[in-house]
Design a protein with these regions (language model features):
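Small-residue-enriched flexible segments
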Residues: 3-40, 44-65, 69-335, 339-348, ...
Length: 388
C-alpha cells in the first residue's frame, strides 16, 4: 500500500568497539530500504552503550536526529537482548520531523517543557508527539503529560521514561543524538498526515479485586485516605500490609484508577509508604476518583500483551511500522523467563513489520483520540503500542 511513513531497524551488540558498531549499523542501513526525504531515529539501548561511547559514535554516524531512552531489554526486528543497542528509523517524503531537548527539569519541569516546546514548534501544531524522559523520582509522569497536552493543544503524545537493570535505577538516561541526560526530556514532533493507531494492554478486568476505594484525601501523588479511612487500613483490609512495607514489592500491586469523568481507567502503581504511612503513588491521585486493586501475574501479562498485538495486526491493513513499550513491572513478573513477553510479541509480528520493543519506567499513551483532542495519559504496568 501507500505508506506515509516507512520504518527500518538497526542494532548492534558491540558495546566496547565503537568503530565496529558503526560499521555494523552502516552495513544494515545499506542492506535496508533507501531512506526517504525526512528521517528520524528512535533509540533504546542498555546503559553500557552510553558509558562506553558507542551510542554517541553510532548516532553521530547517522544523517538524522536520534532520540530515546536507556532500557533494560530491547528488541528490534527479530533480534532481542539485554546488552543491545537498537534504533528504529522512521522515514518519509510527506511527513517531517522536528526534535528538541529541554533544559534541565530539576526545577519547574512544566515551565521548562513549555518553553522548549514553544521554541521548537514555532507555533506550528504537530500531528503527533513522541516524548522521552529519564527516570526522575522527584518528577511525576502525569505532570509531563499534562503540560505536553496543554501546550500542544491536545496533540496525541506517545513515549516512555527510561529504565535500567541496576538495583537503584541510577543509569536511567534519556538519550539524544548520542549524549545521555539524567534531567532533560527530548521530543520528536511529527508534521503531516501520520494517522497513528494506539493500543494499550493493562490488567484484565477479571484480575481486579471487587473492593473499590474512593479517594477521600490526597495531595498530588500522595494518597492519604480512601473511603474516609487512612490508606494503611485499606492495605490491612486487603491483607497487603507486609507488601506495602517492603520496598519495591509495592510495584507488584497494580491498581486501576477511574477518574470518574467518563474516560477509560488508567493503570497505576504504588511506589511505597512514607514516614506518615501515606502511600506514594507513581502519578497524581485526584480526590473523588476511585481505585481498584488488581492482581498481577505472568499469565495475565502474556495474555493481555498477546491480545493487543494480535488485535493491532488484524485491524490494520499492511502496517508499516510498530513501536511498543512495556512496563518494567511486566518484565519482572516473568521471573526467570526474562524474554517471554518479547518473544510472544515478536512471534506475532513474525518479521513482517519493522518493529522496536523496549521496557519502560512509565508509559505515555492516549486512551482516546477524538476530533477535539487526545486524552493523553501516563500509565504504569502497561504495554503500549503505536502503529503506522
Amino acid at each position: 500500500g501507500e505508506y506515509m511513513i516507512r520504518g527500518l531497524t538497526v542494532f548492534t551488540e558491540n558495546i566496547d568497539d565503537p568503530a565496529a558498531a558503526v560499521a555494523e549499523v552502516q552495513a544494515q542501513l545499506e542492506k535496508g530500504p533507501a531512506l526517504l526525504k525526512n528521517s528520524v531515529g528512535i533509540i533504546a539501548c542498555h546503559y553500557e552503550f552510553v558509558l562506553s561511547g558507542t551510542a554517541k559514535a553510532v548516532c553521530e554516524s547517522l544523517p538524522f536526529d536520534v532520540a530515546g531512552t536507556i532500557s533494560s531489554l530491547q528488541a528490534a526486528g527479530e533480534t532481542r537482548g539485554t546488552l543491545l543497542l537498537t534504533i528504529l528509523i522512521l522515514t518519509s517524503d510527506d511527513v517531517s520531523f522536528k526534535t528538541l531537548i529541554t533544559s534541565s527539569l530539576k526545577d519547574e519541569p512544566g515551565k521548562r517543557i513549555e518553553e522548549s516546546y514553544k521554541a521548537a514548534s514555532g507555533g506550528e501544531k504537530p500531528s503527533l508527539i513522541f516524548a522521552y524522559a529519564p527516570f526522575m523520582l522527584e518528577n511525576s509522569g502525569d505532570g509531563y503529560v499534562e503540560v505536553l497536552t496543554r501546550v500542544s493543544g491536545g496533540v496525541p503524545c506517545f513515549g516512555t521514561l527510561a529504565v535500567d537493570d541496576t538495583s537503584d535505577f541510577r543509569e536511567c538516561y534519556m538519550v539524544y543524538n548520542g549524549e545521555h541526560y539524567r534531567d532533560k526530556m527530548s521530543l520528536i514532533l511529527f508534521y503531516g498526515d501520520v494517522n497513528p493507531r494506539f493500543y494499550l494492554a493493562a490488567i484484565s478486568e477479571n484480575k481486579l479485586l471487587d473492593r473499590a476505594a474512593l479517594i477521600t484525601s490526597s495531595e498530588g501523588h500522595i494518597l492519604k485516605e480512601v473511603n474516609g479511612r487512612p490508606v494503611v487500613e485499606y492495605f490491612e483490609d486487603l491483607g497487603l500490609t507486609k507488601a506495602s512495607e517492603t520496598s519495591y514489592a509495592m510495584t507488584s500491586l497494580p491498581f486501576m484508577l477511574d477518574y470518574g469523568d467518563g474516560t477509560p481507567m488508567v493503570s497505576k502503581v504504588f511506589i511505597g509508604l512514607n514516614e506518615e504511612k501515606n502511600a506514594i503513588c507513581a502519578g497524581i491521585m485526584p480526590e473523588g476518583s476511585t481505585l481498584y486493586m488488581g492482581v498481577f501475574d505472568k499469565e495475565d501479562v502474556l495474555f493481555t500483551s498477546g491480545k493487543i498485538i494480535a488485535q493491532a495486526l488484524s485491524e490494520i491493513e499492511n502496517p508499516s511500522v510498530l513501536l511498543g513499550y512495556s512496563c518494567i513491572s511486566r518484565n519482572m513478573s516473568m521471573g526467570s523467563d526474562l524474554f517471554a513477553e518479547v518473544d510472544l510479541i515478536q512471534k506475532e509480528i513474525a518479521g513482517k513489520v519493522p518493529a522496536l520493543l523496549a521496557y519502560s519506567g512509565g508509559e505515555i499513551c492516549p486512551t482516546q483520540i477524538n476530533a477535539a483532542a487526545a486524552i493523553n495519559r501516563f500509565h504504569n504496568n502497561t504495554f503500549i503500542l503505536c502503529v503506522f
